[in-house]
């Protein structure tokens, strides 16, 4: 919506009506306003009028960094931290087959939501790949494990002599291509209809 005082009052009135109808109390003090291309003084005045906090881009929504530009590496470090926390010391004592199962079933599946939504920088993909390799090859007492096979070979399907480990870079590209497929085929999805109706009518 536009940075307009009157529209803001209408929005607050709608939210208050929703609160009265559903008995769900809205806590405006815990809400945040994220202005885009709005002067700081105007944004601050609107936030005071609405009774909420004034946020800034990028912000986190459902764990994803949301902003008007491509996320930087520092914005995606929480994903790396999350995967490293799952790389517990107990995995060092597992047999090699169990480590492979751990990599395929848990470590490689953690970033799927990010891979579906964002084009991850190569720096982040390399760090995630490092965590996969550590989980698979590192043994107790070692800071880093010595790879017993080249990583591209490990990422091949098992029927082609590989270990079936998910290549996160290729997975990222494949998951993002589904949006292009939906757009090209004019899928019955709100965002597809909006773009086609707005720019390609």
Enumerate the language-model features and the residues they cover:
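Nucleotidyl polymerases of mobile genetic elements and RNA viruses
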Residues: 1-201
């Amino acid at each position: 919506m536009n940075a307009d005082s009157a529209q803001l009052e209408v929005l607050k009135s709608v939210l208050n009506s929703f609160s009265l109808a559903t008995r769900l109390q809205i806590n405006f003090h815990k809400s945040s306003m994220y202005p885009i291309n709005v002067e700081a003084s105007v944004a601050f005045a609107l936030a005071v009028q609405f009774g909420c906090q004034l946020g800034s881009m990028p912000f986190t929504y459902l764990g994803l960094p949301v902003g008007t530009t491509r996320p930087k590496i520092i914005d995606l470090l929480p994903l790396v931290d999350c995967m490293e926390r799952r790389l517990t010391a107990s995995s060092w004592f597992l047999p090699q087959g169990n480590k492979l199962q751990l990599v395929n079933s848990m470590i490689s599946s953690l970033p799927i939501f990010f891979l579906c939504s964002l084009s991850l920088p190569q720096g982040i993909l390399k760090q995630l790949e490092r965590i996969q390799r550590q989980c698979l090859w590192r043994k107790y007492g070692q800071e880093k494990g010595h790879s017993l096979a080249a990583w591209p070979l490990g990422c091949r399907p098992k029927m082609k002599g590989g270990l079936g480990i998910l290549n996160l870079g290729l997975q990222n590209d494949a998951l993002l291509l589904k949006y292009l497929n939906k757009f090209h085929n004019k899928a019955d999805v709100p965002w597809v209809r909006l773009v086609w109706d707005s720019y390609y009518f």
